[in-house]
Amino acid sequence: MVNQFDLNAARAAAERMVTLPPRLVIHGEPGIGKTTFGANAPGCVFIKTENGCDALGVPALPVEGVCETWDQVLQAFDAVLEAPEGVQWVVLDSLNGAHQLCRQYICDRDFNGVWTSKRGVEGYNAWAAGDKASSMEIKRLLAKADEVRAANIGIMMLGHTGLHKQGDACGADFYKFGMDMEPRSWNFVLQWADQVGHACREFTTGKRDGENRAKATMMNSDRWLVFDGGPSRDAKCRAGYDMPAKIILSFEEYQSKLKSPSAEVLRGQALNLIADSSDKVKDIIKSKLAASTAAEVKKQISTMSLQRVQTMVNWLIANNNAEG
């Protein structure tokens, strides 16, 4: 029996460790291309709670219609586990729909189908009891997805964007983009996922002469998948599953970046961000790296640790956004 606290055994286990496929979660507005993104994944099988993939010619469960109960969603994952040959990606479309089926399941199981409390009858919405129970069921879904992932199958969960109220200990509360689902359940998904991307377009806001309110104008027709999270959106990449701050919303683009070495992707991103920065920012970088030329900066970055490059990229993004 292996001593679980044997350092030599830990080193040997680390050398044998194989990186599993990513757990990718994407939230975005309806119609932006999330389902098309998933359908372009090789060896994909959809689990449907809505019929967005019907015209795309991809295998999907259930064969006809969509999952109508929470148990059917879990059963679909079991079906993949029973016949995993040829499956490279499982795509849940959508997580919002699965979450609503989960809530209905809890309401029927624990509250006899009563959503709103009445005199002497406690409903799903009483003291958030229903949502708390639902979040535990969402953890059950994530565990089921991990069983599939252990068979070397990537997990992709798609859903619609909503607004989540975020508390701020140092100022006024604010809203941020995230999956349109109950916050407790969404937080469990956020913690579980290796990558969370926000599918969106780029907008600019401004007031025209004589107008009192600013209007949003789409900058171009490009659709992006943003992995750089912050106060405005929930997005992230776990170490080992690093991606650029944003990529074109295309599975081919995603796959090409995913295959690149993490450090190489970050170093290239850092150099691109520096090239697009103001002279002031470039001077700060040169000073920090004790470099006098762009070539010396590039050489320094090529030998940096992954963590240090990531810190630089985050700083450059924040400064470029502030200046822009």
What feature does the model see in each segment?
Residues 54-116, 128:
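Conserved nucleotide-sensing/catalytic segment adjacent to the nucleotide-binding pocket
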